[in-house]
Amino acid sequence: MWGGRFNEQVDALMAQFNNSFSFDRRMWREDIRGSIAWARQLARVGVISAEERDTLVDGLNMVYAEFADGRFEARETDEDIHTAVERRLGELVGTVAGKLHTGRSRNDQVATDVRLWTLGAIRRIDDRLRALQTALLAQAETAGAALMPGYTHLQRAQPVLLAHWLLAHFWPLQRDRERLADCAKRTATLPLGSGAIAGTPLMVDRTALAVELGMTAVSPNSIDAVSDRDFIAEFLFCAALIGTHLSRLAEDMIIYSSAEFGFVTLADAYSTGSSLMPQKKNPDSFELLRGKAGRLTGDLIAVLTMLKGLPSAYDKDLQEDKEPLFDAADTLELALPVAAGAVATARFHPDRMRAALDDAMLATDLADYLVARGVPFREAHHIVGRLVREAEQRGVALSALPLEVFLAAHPVCEPDVLQVFDFDRSVAMRRVPGATAPEAVNEQIAQARRCVEER
């Protein structure tokens, strides 16, 4: 493809070092699609005849079929997916294959391929995010009015609905989907026609190329177009953040499934055992999901580090963009269905969750009681803090303090102060949009349902 200027053969180790076919071969669909579109433009501008165009398109479709059914045979000389396709095309249709690359560089060719591939990955990952959202939503709809302790700093804080906690993991995934959709808008910019750096001398219709390939715009600057990998960095950031959200869900599920909590039992299908301890049932699905966050962050850092310090236009360093990209996509395309399955088959235990509720979690409600009767919140906070300390010193629950202690705490306290110690009442009082009251959560469920149905 490029050997005419050289007097010596490439060193065998250098050839191995330079070769990317082992990993970029997965872009065969995109490479062939781009080449078919390019062949049509070559015919439109008169570089090849209609007959030659048809020969090239037919040949490329034959190469496509060989890849699709696993018959494609690679050669040691296949430096990358582009050379592999062109080499096989030449074997099938003869010397006319040599005209296909007219006016095109591998610089704009690979930039086009990887954008097309990334757009496909975004669609697949969005589908899997939606499936995980659906699993969380189904559990939330089933949970009804079940209560659980809400935690901050992993300390008991306030009672919340189980459904509210489940949906707390739904909305980060919705933001992930929105970020990916936004990333897709910038990814769908066509570099083809930019050549190596200065643009092609052929008056191809780049807008028509973009339309044929499902792109929404053409790149405005050829130098930028062949070196722009912003979309990969952006995709990898989205992937790393998805990993972080999966890690948070996993951490909660791991903790809540432990014997010390007992809030949820994971299905056998998403658990493993111990080679030594017969009694063990380990939450390996969620532990691996938690671990993948580090891998996804590593993929992002690898690409950002590679991009730092590059001069403008194309450099071979950019070949290093694909393995982190492919790895991140592969990781999520497996991790997300595992997460969805593990969530969908998990069995929650509302009775154990309610048993874990503690009267001290209603201390804020007691402060609210005082505030409703005109006591400044900071003073109310201090008063309730003293009552909590009094209960701790007596070794009793906050609600078990004698009524006289509450009445003596502040003149506004009346016997009805003990009504504060009702977990269901506490939850029901938090009715603002986004809060944990049943009516607020029902509206949240309806909103979440619209999100998954609208795709």
From Swiss-Prot:
GO molecular function: argininosuccinate lyase activity
Keyword Amino-acid biosynthesis attributed: yes
GO cellular component terms given for this protein: cytosol
Localization per Swiss-Prot or TrEMBL: Cytoplasm
The keyword Nucleotide-binding is assigned to this record: no
Enzyme class: lyase
PROSITE patterns linked: FUMARATE_LYASES
Swiss-Prot/TrEMBL GO biological process terms: arginine biosynthetic process via ornithine; L-arginine biosynthetic process
EC number: 4.3.2.1
A Pfam entry, by short name: ASL_C2
Alphabetized PANTHER family for the sequence: ARGININOSUCCINATE LYASE
UniProt-listed NCBIfam families: argH
Protein's recorded name: Argininosuccinate lyase
Organism this protein belongs to: Roseiflexus sp. (strain RS-1)
